[in-house]
């Protein structure tokens, strides 16, 4: 998900065990998602090849040191919704159109607004200047929300493609979180947006967040699980890096996730808290 949320929650244990049966050159648990970490604690980051973070929360010195050690920073960039704690909130609030379920501090935004698109590219340039390897592009699912709201989802799709292409042109890798329906439709249209996408990141493929307030997790339904897996396989076939982010404490489910991701050569991170601390 995202978030600079809960300051008072202590970090909880995070899951990731090396699979010694996997061929040596690939380890699926080389990815860490720390989007909720708000201090400058980079302890453990050196153990990961890829980490997703709110890059503004870390010093340039630490970013540079860890990058030199082989850690690649994927900096959070929310292209599809607007959070009320961003310093540009007042400038773009009028372009929002729908509340975001389970995240009361943000609303979906009309990405067709040219000023918004320009801001996303400007922010991405700043992230690159700070040492980002790429961006963790969140809330591309605004495309699906536009469909549900009977808005011009085609225009939303064109706007998303433009943002992706322009950010990739900066020399940044683009890892898109979610957007399964967007990519499904773009594949059907034989669109060239895939040329600008480096990675595909999907949450809750195997797991499901049942209660956002109390970190209660369940199991994803078979239909959605199969759909997410099919999109992930499609992206892999197109040569993209694939990442799963799961939320669970169920040992059987954890093992299933590990086995599946390692067999498919997908990167994965398993957390027992939605805060991703």
Q: Where do the language-model regions lie?
A:
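Glycan-processing catalytic domains of CAZymes
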Residues: 21-277
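Positively charged n-region of N-terminal signal peptides that target proteins for export
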Residues: 1-4
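Sec-dependent N-terminal signal peptides
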Residues: 6-9
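C-terminal motif of bacterial Sec signal peptides marking the signal peptidase cleavage site
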Residues: 14-16
């Amino acid at each position: 998900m995202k978030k600079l949320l809960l300051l008072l929650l202590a970090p909880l244990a995070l899951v990731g065990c090396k699979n010694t049966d996997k061929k040596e050159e690939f380890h699926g648990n080389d990815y860490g998602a720390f989007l909720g970490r708000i201090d400058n604690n980079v302890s453990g980051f050196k153990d990961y090849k890829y980490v997703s973070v709110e890059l503004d929360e870390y010093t340039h010195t630490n970013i540079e040191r860890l990058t030199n050690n082989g850690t690649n920073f994927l900096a959070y960039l929310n292209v599809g919704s607007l959070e009320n704690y961003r310093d540009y909130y007042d400038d773009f609030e009028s372009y929002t159109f729908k509340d975001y379920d389970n995240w009361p501090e943000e609303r979906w935004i009309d990405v067709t607004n040219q000023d918004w698109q320009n801001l996303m590219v400007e922010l991405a340039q700043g992230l690159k200047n700070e040492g980002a390897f790429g961006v963790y592009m969140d809330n591309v699912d605004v495309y699906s929300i536009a469909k549900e709201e009977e808005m011009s989802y085609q225009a939303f799709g064109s706007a998303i493609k433009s943002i992706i292409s322009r950010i990739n042109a900066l020399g940044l890798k683009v890892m898109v979180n979610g957007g399964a329906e967007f990519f499904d439709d773009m594949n059907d249209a034989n669109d060239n947006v895939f040329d600008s996408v480096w990675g595909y990141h999907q949450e809750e493929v195997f797991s499901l967040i049942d209660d956002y307030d109390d970190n209660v997790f369940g199991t994803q339904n078979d239909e959605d699980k199969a759909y997410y897996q099919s999109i992930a396989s499609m992206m892999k076939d197109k040569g993209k890096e694939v990442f799963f982010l799961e939320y669970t404490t169920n040992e059987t489910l954890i093992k299933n996730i590990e086995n599946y991701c390692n067999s498919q050569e997908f990167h994965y991170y398993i957390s027992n808290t939605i805060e991703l601390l």
